[in-house]
């Protein structure tokens, strides 16, 4: 997947459409195998990266890759407003400059047009399952990598969202591993030769 990172104007992005194409091609190959019966599909990826989705359901920009340098120093900037101890107490997540919390705060401080226009924010596995099903969800384990989830309530922490200018409504419904996300869209069924196979939420973070 590293080959699907590209650099443009000094920033690193994922080509999410190319990742989706790989998934569709893989499903096509699997559908042709007579000795394989596909009963469900699950997607996991690396953590922290996300896609901004517009009101029309389209992606507003290719997602930044966590290797992008724009978050250098971002934690220190955030901790001038919210104490580090509070953030760690809520989330229990190791502070790293590329965590979604700091990516989002960097975009907010830079008046990023995609974030400003975002109706929904989808983490990478949820963005890919959305492309397969048309359903927008937020899977718990992938959300936990964002440093936005309260480890006690298992919900997004409002105090952090408020600091980012976001609300719970900016995220898809919460799902947990084993929950049903939806079924393949008619378009994906036509492209792959598969039927209405369910997409099931798995532990979406690859090291969960």
Task: Label the model's feature ranges.
Residues 72-83:
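Hinge/lid segment of periplasmic solute-binding proteins
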